[in-house]
Amino acid sequence: MRLLERVRKEWFMVGIVVAIGAAKLEPSVGVNGGPLKPEITVSYIAVATIFFNSGLSLKTEELTSALVHLKLHLFIQVFTLAFFPTTIWLFLQLLSVTSINEWLLKGLQTVGCMPPPVSSAVILTKAVGGNEAAAIFNSAFGSFLGIVVTPVLLLLFLGSSSSVPFTSIFSQLFMTVVVPLVIGQIVRRYIKDWLERKKPPFGVVSSSVLLMIIYTTFCDTFSNPNIDLDKFSLILILFIIVSIQLSFMLLTFVFSTRNNSGFTPADTVAIIFCSTHKSLTLGIPMLKIVFAGHEHLSLISLPLLIYHPAQILLGSVLVPTIKSWMVSRQKGVKLTRPTV
């Protein structure tokens, strides 16, 4: 019974495993030109559905509630979309001389280029008791920013423009991401009261569509006889991903707790999660667009598929520790305040 409850709670993680397993059993169903017609249903309909859903669920006022804390927002966005991908690129120059599969290494670079997720960083910040408003703003703002910045970073670091025209990427992104998002926000204005009363399962809808995208991505993988992935590379990539997450969490903690940083303990909590988490919901559709038709798309996507559950699991494990630190630091601040 406890196992069933756990499966129900972690249904998306289980769904990823099932989707990959189903793709392995019968990859012909989800390949381009197959019965599911992913070149239409995934590339356009599924991606547009995810972002229309995001437009419906995202409260516009959340983007302005924490707008005044410019220093915090600048720190998070620069770390996420500049420092993170650049550091990963430098690190990969060292790893390029190893025997690790080159497409997995390219996948690690794509992880660095991704924007923050809309949900997980906010959920963990709230669980700790950190600055939730800042987490909401930066997750939402970072997602919007990522629509433009992430494709540019992918083209810059991976040079995929040789196979996919730059204008083609942005036209498809505009039609499948920006337009549905804006339409979702417009529709939300007219049914706002109903949405707040009924609270539709937006997260479940987006995650379900995302599982379809993951399934068709791996159908392409398993139907390609040229792909060869050794277990050593896979295990090593998992170790590298966890090491990257821990290292960057420690870095953001050190930077944001300096005496002259100007950040509160609650701000630091939001910074730790928002600066180091990467979006799977935005990432996979973007990779599908930027690397459309690429024979190694699934290998490029694999590090992000590993990074996403790893960041949630690692963050969940660290919640009690970070919460204990924040509470003790806040008590210390109160005790050191001069009495009037």
Swiss-Prot record:
GO cellular component: endoplasmic reticulum; endoplasmic reticulum membrane; Golgi apparatus; Golgi membrane; plasma membrane
Topological domain ranges for the Cytoplasmic compartment: 1-10, 59-71, 138, 185-201, 256-270, 320-340
Gene3D superfamilies for this protein: 1.20.1530.20
Keyword hit for Cell membrane: yes
The gene coding this protein: Slc10a7
Name of the protein this chain belongs to: Sodium/bile acid cotransporter 7
Function, as annotated: Involved in teeth and skeletal development. Has an essential role in the biosynthesis and trafficking of glycosaminoglycans and glycoproteins to produce a proper functioning extracellular matrix. Required for extracellular matrix mineralization. Also involved in the regulation of cellular calcium homeostasis. Does not show transport activity towards bile acids or steroid sulfates (including taurocholate, cholate, chenodeoxycholate, estrone-3-sulfate, dehydroepiandrosterone sulfate (DHEAS) and pregnenolone sulfate).
Membrane topology type: Multi-pass membrane protein
Domain of life, source organism: Eukaryota
